[in-house]
């Protein structure tokens, strides 16, 4: 488990516990990619950052996951998340930025974690109405 803090109002929130950071990162990315086809992965991952790297930029620089048209190559032996974990070990991630809308969808899809997701959402103190593309800045600390 990890201690989670959310950046809000110029400071880090109180810690939120009860959720593994690797699970949060993988679930957030999977839930976003689930809504679209893998061909649209670059657009779908806009707003996601891991350890201050935009996920889309990091993968673009690597070059071997995309074909010459910029379309994601489906490698049969490894999933997108396994590929990402090889490039950025998710267990070592200290910061994660993700769209708030993705976390709201996750809250409705996973009733067993809805209370923890709601704590994270509430800690953001996001403006209402929330602007399109609004992202959470999350910091992880080991428990």
Regions found by a protein language model. Give the residues of each.
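Acidic (Asp/Glu-rich) sequence patches and key acidic residues
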Residues: 1-143
């Amino acid at each position: 488990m990890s201690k989670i803090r959310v950046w809000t109002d110029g400071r880090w929130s109180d810690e939120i516990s009860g959720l593994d950071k690797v699970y949060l990162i993988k679930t957030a990315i999977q839930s976003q990619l689930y809504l679209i086809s893998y061909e649209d992965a670059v657009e779908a991952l806009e707003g996601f950052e891991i350890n201050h790297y935009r996920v889309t930029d990091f993968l673009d620089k690597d070059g071997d996951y995309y074909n010459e048209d910029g379309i994601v190559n489906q490698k049969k032996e490894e999933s997108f998340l396994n590929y990402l974990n090889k490039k950025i070990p998710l267990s070592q991630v200290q910061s994660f930025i993700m769209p708030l809308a993705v976390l709201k969808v996750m809250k409705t899809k996973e009733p067993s974690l809805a209370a923890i997701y709601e704590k994270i959402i509430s800690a953001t103190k996001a403006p209402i109405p929330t602007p399109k593309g609004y992202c959470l800045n999350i910091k992880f600390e080991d428990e």
